[in-house]
C-alpha cells in the first residue's frame, strides 16, 4: 500500500550469480528462492563448481533428514529450488553431472532402525515441473519422441500428487509379505509389521486364484487424512505433546514407529498409484504391458483385488484437459481428504511407457506438476503484541521475510497466548509457515530438528498484563475467553490507529494513500520516541560500516534535549474529514537510523561495484516530517515543451503550488518552500472523495465488532439508510439471513452506546454526517447485468481502483475473481497487466479494455 511517509531506501543483496553471492548463500528458504532467478549460463566453471558443491551438500543433507530421519530440515519449496538449480548447473556444465550427484538419486539412504531389503524392481521418483510452459514442453516432447500424429489423441492419466510417503507392497500368491519404504529406490526399509496395521491395505488380495499373480509389487502412498491429522494433534495437545506441523510429518512419524501398536492408533490411509514387478503362474516375470494394456487397466485390476485407488484420478486425452485438472485442484486443494502438492501426469498406454523408457531416477513417461509452495521454513525473530481496532491484544510473529504462495511474508498472527503455548514455539525457532490459497499466512509450528546446538538462542514468549499502548490493565471479556482485551476503546492510541487503518481499507473508504504508517503518524506521532537523549541522533538516517566492522559508539552532543511531545492531529476518527494540509505541516515521526554495510565486489567486466546491505536498526532515532517535505528550492516553472518559463524581464519563474509555504529566498531570489508531499495531497483528495461512498463501506469503516464487508453489504441492502439500521433491535437484526445472534447483539449494542450522551461513537457518527459522508445505499434498483458471470481485473484502470472495480462487478450480481480459469467469462486488462492476461490468452478467455468494461457493467455484454 502506498503511504504518505517517506519510504526507506531499497537495499539489495549481492547481485545474483556474483562470487560474493555464491559465498554468502545460506541454507534458508529465502536464499533458496533466489536460485530461481540465477542464469547459470553466465557462471564460469569455478563459480559453477563452488555453487554445485554447496547445493549438493545441502540437498544430500535434506534427503537424509526427509527420507531417513523423518525430520525435514528444509521446506519442499527450498528443496525443489536447490534440486532444480543443480539440474540446470549439470546441464550447462556436464562435468558436474556424475553418478554420485544427488540429482540421480531417488530418495535417501536407509536408517538402522529397520532391516534393509532390496526392491524386486527399482522404485523410481518423478521429475518435477513448476509452470505450464515446462509442462507443455514435456507434453510436446513425449508426442515427438513417440512420433505421435498431431491429429491423434494421446490418452494419459492425471492423478493428484499426495503429500505422503511412498510405499512398496509385495504380495506373494495374494498374501501381503512385505511393505518397504522407498529408501534410495533400490533398497528400502522393511516396515511390514507397521504396514499391516493400516486398515485400507488388504493383507490378502481378493479374487479367484487364477486372477491373483504369484508375486506383484503395488506402489502407492501412505498418508494421513485431514480429519485424522486434526484428531491426532488434539490428542497430542491434551497429552502435553507438541503438535505435528503437517500430515506428511505425522504420517512419517507414525509409519516408522518401532511399536506397531502406536502406528495402529494413528489411522493411516493408503492409495495405490503404480505397479512394479509382476510374476504369474508360470513362475517367470512377465512385462506388465503383456497382461495389462494401460495404467487405468492396472487401477481397475487393483480395485478388483480390494486395493484402494484415489477417487480423484482422471483419464485425459489432450493438454487442455490436463490444465483443467490442474486448475480445479489448485482451487480445491483444501477441499479433499488429504494434503496434495501437485498433479501427476502419466502416459496411459504401458507399451508406450516402455518405449519412452526412464532416466536413472525417473520415468520419461510421467511428470509431476508442482503447485506453488504453501509451506516454507523461516526464522521466528520475535513475538510482539498488537492491539487491534476492537481492543483485542494479539501476539504477532515477526519472521525473517520469506516468499510463500505468491507473496512475501514477514509477520503473521499467533491469535493468543494459548495458541503460542499450544504450538510449542520459542522465539528464535526455525518455524513452518503455511499460506494456502489467499488465506492469511499461518505459523504452523517449530522445526524441532533445527533446535539442536541453538538452545541458548531460544526463549519463551511472555504475554503482557497491561496494554503496551495505553498501559490499561488487560482483561478477558467473559469467562472462558482466550483473548485478552484492552477496555480503553476511546483513548487507546493503538486502537485508534487500527480503526483509522481499517476505515482507509479498500473495502471501507478506500483511502489508498492513508497507510499504516500514516495512520500512526496521525494518531500517535510519538510512537517509537526514545526513552533518553542518549538515543536521540538528529539528522542521522544511516550509519555506514565496512564488512565486519561495528558502528562507532554514539555520544549525544552536549546540551541536546529531546523535542517536546507532540499532540496527535487525530484524537478520534471523528475529525478525519476535517483534515487540511496545513494541519499536517508540523507532524513529525520517529525513525531508527539503519546500519548499512557497504560491500565491494568486481563484476564480470572487471568493474568494482558497491552493494549496500542493511544490517538492521542501530538503536539511534531521529525525527522526520511525516506529511510535508523539508525546506527546499521551489522548482522552475516549465512550459509544454519542458522549457523554463521566464517573466517579461527574462527572469525565470518558479512553481509554487497554492498549498505550499514560502519560508525564505535563496540565491537570485529563488523561493525556499515547504509543501505537502504528493502522497499527502493524494491522501487528502481521497479523503474528500470518500464522503460520497456507499453505506456498506461506511459500516465497515465504523469498526463495529463482527461486521465485515459481507455483513455490511447485507445490512446496507436491507436497511438502505444508517438511521434505519440504528433503530433496529437485536431481534429484528437476527431475522435477516446471515445475521446471527452474536452479530445482531454487537450491532444493536454499538448503536445503543452511540446514542448515550457524550459517547465517542456518537460523536464519530455526528461528525461524519456533518462533513457530508453518505449514510445511504447507492445501488437500489441497480440492474443485475452480470448475474452468474465471472470477471477478472488485472493491471491499472484509469477510472477504477481495484476495489471499486470489484465492487462494481459484485453490485451487478457478478463474481469478481482473483484468478483466471476456464470458468472466467471476461478478463479486464488495464495498464501493466500481470500474468493473468497471459493466462487468459492461453485459455482463450475474452480480454476487454476499460471502455468495454464500462459497456459490460451497463449492458452485460461488450458488443
From Swiss-Prot:
Keywords: DNA damage, DNA repair, DNA replication, Ligase, Magnesium, Manganese, Metal-binding, NAD, Zinc. Zn(2+) binds at residues 467, 470, 486, 492. Residues 241-253 have a biased composition (Low complexity). Residues 781-863 form the BRCT domain. Its cofactor is Mg(2+); Mn(2+). One of its GO terms (molecular function) is metal ion binding. GO terms for cellular component: cytosol. DNA ligase that catalyzes the formation of phosphodiester linkages between 5'-phosphoryl and 3'-hydroxyl groups in double-stranded DNA using NAD as a coenzyme and as the energy source for the reaction. It is essential for DNA replication and repair of damaged DNA. Belongs to the NAD-dependent DNA ligase family. LigA subfamily. This is DNA ligase. It comes from Bifidobacterium animalis subsp. lactis (strain AD011). The gene is ligA.
Amino acid at each position: 500500500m502506498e503511504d504518505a511517509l517517506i519510504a526507506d531506501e531499497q537495499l539489495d543483496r549481492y547481485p545474483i550469480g556474483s562470487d560474493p553471492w555464491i559465498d554468502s548463500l545460506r541454507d534458508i528458504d529465502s536464499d533458496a528462492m533466489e536460485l530461481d532467478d540465477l542464469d547459470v549460463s553466465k557462471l564460469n566453471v569455478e563459480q559453477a563448481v563452488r555453487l554445485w558443491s554447496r547445493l549438493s551438500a545441502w540437498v544430500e543433507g535434506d534427503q537424509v533428514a526427509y527420507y531417513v530421519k523423518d525430520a525435514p530440515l528444509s521446506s519442499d519449496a527450498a528443496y525443489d529450488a536447490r534440486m532444480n538449480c543443480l539440474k540446470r548447473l549439470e546441464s550447462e556444465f556436464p562435468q558436474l553431472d556424475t553418478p554420485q550427484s544427488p540429482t540421480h538419486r531417488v530418495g535417501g539412504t536407509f536408517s538402522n532402525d529397520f532391516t534393509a531389503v532390496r526392491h524386486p524392481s527399482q522404485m523410481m521418483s518423478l521429475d518435477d515441473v513448476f509452470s505450464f510452459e515446462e509442462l507443455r514442453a514435456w507434453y510436446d516432447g513425449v508426442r515427438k519422441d513417440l512420433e505421435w500424429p498431431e491429429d491423434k489423441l494421446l490418452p494419459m492419466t492425471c492423478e493428484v500428487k499426495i503429500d505422503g510417503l511412498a510405499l512398496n507392497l509385495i504380495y506373494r500368491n495374494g498374501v501381503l509379505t512385505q511393505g518397504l519404504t522407498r529408501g534410495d529406490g533400490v533398497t528400502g526399509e522393511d516396515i511390514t509389521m507397521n504396514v499391516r496395521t493400516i486398515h485400507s491395505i488388504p493383507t490378502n488380495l481378493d479374487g479367484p486364484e487364477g486372477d491373483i499373480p504369484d508375486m506383484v509389487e503395488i506402489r502407492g502412498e501412505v498418508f494421513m487424512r485431514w480429519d485424522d491429522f486434526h484428531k491426532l494433534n488434539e490428542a497430542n495437545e491434551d497429552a502435553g505433546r507438541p503438535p505435528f506441523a503437517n500430515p506428511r510429518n505425522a504420517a512419517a512419524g507414525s509409519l516408522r514407529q518401532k511399536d506397531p501398536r502406536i502406528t495402529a492408533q494413528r489411522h493411516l490411509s493408503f492409495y495405490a498409484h503404480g505397479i512394479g514387478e509382476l510374476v504369474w503362474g508360470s513362475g517367470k516375470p512377465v512385462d506388465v504391458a503383456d497382461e495389462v494394456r494401460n495404467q487405468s487397466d492396472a487401477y481397475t485390476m487393483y480395485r478388483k483385488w480390494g486395493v484402494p485407488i484415489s477417487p480423484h484420478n482422471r483419464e485425459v486425452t489432450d493438454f487442455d484437459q490436463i490444465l483443467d485438472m490442474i486448475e480445479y485442484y489448485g482451487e480445491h486443494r483444501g477441499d479433499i481428504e488429504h494434503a496434495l502438492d501437485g498433479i501427476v501426469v502419466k502416459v496411459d498406454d504401458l507399451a508406450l511407457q516402455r518405449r519412452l523408457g526412464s532416466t536413472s531416477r525417473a520415468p520419461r513417461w510421467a511428470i509431476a506438476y508442482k503447485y506453488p509452495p504453501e509451506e516454507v521454513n523461516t526464522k521466528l525473530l520475535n513475538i510482539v503484541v498488537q492491539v487491534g481496532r476492537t481492543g483485542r491484544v494479539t501476539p504477532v510473529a515477526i519472521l525473517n521475510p520469506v516468499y510463500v504462495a505468491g507473496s512475501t511474508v514477514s509477520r503473521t498472527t499467533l491469535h493468543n497466548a494459548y495458541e503460542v503455548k499450544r504450538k510449542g514455539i520459542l522465539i528464535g525457532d526455525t518455524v513452518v509457515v503455511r499460506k494456502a490459497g489467499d488465506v492469511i499466512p499461518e505459523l504452523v509450528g517449530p522445526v524441532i530438528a533445527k533446535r539442536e546446538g541453538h538452545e541458548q538462542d531460544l526463549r519463551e514468549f511472555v504475554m503482557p498484563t497491561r496494554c503496551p499502548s495505553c498501559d490499561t490493565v488487560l482483561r478477558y471479556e467473559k469467562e472462558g475467553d482466550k483473548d485478552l482485551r484492552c477496555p480503553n476503546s476511546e483513548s487507546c492510541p493503538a486502537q485508534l490507529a487500527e480503526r483509522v487503518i481499517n476505515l482507509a481499507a479498500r473495502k471501507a473508504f478506500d483511502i489508498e494513500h492513508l497507510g499504516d504508517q500514516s495512520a500512526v503518524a496521525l494518531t500517535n506521532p510519538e510512537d517509537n520516541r526514545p526513552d533518553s537523549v542518549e538515543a536521540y541522533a538528529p539528522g542521522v538516517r544511516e550509519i555506514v560500516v565496512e564488512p565486519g566492522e561495528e558502528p562507532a559508539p554514539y555520544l549525544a552532543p552536549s546540551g541536546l534535549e529531546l523535542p517536546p511531545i507532540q499532540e496527535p492531529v487525530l484524537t478520534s476518527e471523528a475529525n478525519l474529514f476535517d483534515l487540511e494540509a496545513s494541519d499536517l505541516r508540523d507532524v513529525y515521526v520517529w525513525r531508527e537510523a539503519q546500519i548499512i554495510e557497504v560491500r565491494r565486489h568486481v563484476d564480470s567486466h572487471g568493474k568494482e561495484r558497491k552493494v549496500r546491505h542493511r544490517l538492521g536498526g542501530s538503536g539511534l532515532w531521529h525525527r522526520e516530517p511525516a506529511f510535508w517535505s523539508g525546506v527546499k528550492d521551489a522548482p522552475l516553472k516549465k512550459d509544454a515543451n519542458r522549457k523554463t518559463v521566464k517573466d517579461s524581464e527574462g527572469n525565470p519563474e518558479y512553481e509554487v503550488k497554492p498549498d505550499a509555504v514560502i519560508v525564505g529566498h535563496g540565491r537570485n531570489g529563488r523561493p525556499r518552500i515547504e509543501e505537502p508531499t504528493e502522497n499527502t495531497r493524494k491522501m487528502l483528495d481521497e479523503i474528500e472523495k470518500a464522503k460520497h461512498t456507499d453505506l456498506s463501506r461506511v459500516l465497515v469503516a465504523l469498526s463495529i465488532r463482527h461486521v465485515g464487508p459481507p455483513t455490511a453489504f447485507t445490512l446496507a441492502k436491507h436497511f438502505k439508510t444508517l438511521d434505519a439500521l440504528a433503530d433496529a433491535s437485536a431481534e429484528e437484526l437476527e431475522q435477516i439471513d446471515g445475521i446471527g445472534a452474536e452479530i445482531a447483539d454487537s450491532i444493536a449494542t454499538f448503536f445503543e452506546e452511540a446514542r448515550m450522551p457524550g459517547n465517542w461513537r456518537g460523536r464519530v457518527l455526528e461528525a461524519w454526517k456533518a462533513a457530508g459522508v453518505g449514510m445511504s445505499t447507492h445501488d437500489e434498483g441497480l440492474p443485475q447485468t452480470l448475474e452468474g458471470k465471472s470477471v477478472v481485473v488485472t493491471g491499472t484502470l484509469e477510472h477504477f481502483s481495484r476495489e471499486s472495480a470489484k465492487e462494481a462487478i459484485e453490485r451487478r450480481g457478478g463474481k469478481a475473481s482473483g484468478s483466471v480459469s476456464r470458468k472466467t467469462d471476461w478478463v479486464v486488462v488495464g495498464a501493466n497487466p500481470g500474468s493473468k492476461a497471459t493466462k487468459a490468452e492461453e485459455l482463450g478467455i475474452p480480454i476487454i479494455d476499460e471502455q468495454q468494461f464500462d459497456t459490460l457493467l451497463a449492458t452485460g455484454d461488450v458488443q
